[in-house]
């Protein structure tokens, strides 16, 4: 199965997922946007930043669910961030890892993930809840459990490369996305980010 199949499943399983903040990169950003269009989605261009940005959001906004949609290449580029995330252990942070063993967005070069165990790496860094799943049903069970419980969780799954042929393009770049995301936070959290004097009633 492909990553898109799993993303569609979690969007259906979590009734209030529309309120979650979701950080992603690469093709996963387009796929998630097709599943759940929202200004609560943040796309990062640089591999390796997804988990740290998502963890920072989770720490700053403990009342919000935050999801990181990570890939194996990006995950391996930020191993140094795992101990920090585990030390802070934000319970509202769900870390999803889709491992297709390639850098898909940049041409399909193989990653080193087939020679490393992401769950072992996460547990070694201090994640108490980290697991591999082998099917869509297992993935759904683990995701719902993580969604309902307040504990830092990594869910990892091997997926086939590829995307749907009819996947719609993203009609905004990272700059516009960033500002829309911040305005979304200002509106939903009733706090100023760009303007400390922000008035939520305006």
Give the role of each language-model region:
Residues 20-25, 42-43, 68, 131-134, ...:
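General beta-strand structural signal in soluble alpha/beta enzymes
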């Amino acid at each position: 199965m492909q990553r898109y199949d799993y993303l569609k499943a979690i969007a259906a399983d979590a009734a209030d997922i529309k309120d979650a903040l979701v950080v992603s990169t690469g093709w996963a950003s387009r796929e998630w946007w097709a599943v759940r269009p929202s200004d609560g989605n943040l796309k990062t261009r640089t591999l390796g930043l997804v988990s740290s940005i998502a963890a920072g959001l989770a720490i700053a906004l403990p009342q919000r669910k935050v999801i990181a949609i990570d890939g194996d290449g990006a995950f391996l580029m930020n191993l140094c961030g795992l101990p920090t995330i585990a030390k802070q252990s934000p319970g509202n942070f769900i870390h999803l890892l889709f491992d297709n063993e390639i850098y898909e967005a940049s041409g399909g070069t193989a990653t080193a993930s087939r020679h490393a165990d992401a769950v072992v790496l996460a547990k070694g860094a201090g994640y108490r809840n980290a697991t591999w799943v082998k099917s869509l049903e297992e993935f759904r069970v683990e995701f719902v459990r993580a969604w309902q419980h307040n504990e830092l969780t990594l869910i990892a799954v091997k997926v086939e490369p590829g995307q749907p042929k009819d996947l719609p393009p993203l009609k905004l770049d990272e700059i516009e996305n960033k500002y829309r995301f911040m305005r979304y936070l200002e509106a939903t959290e009733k706090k100023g980010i760009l303007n400390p004097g922000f008035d939520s009633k305006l």
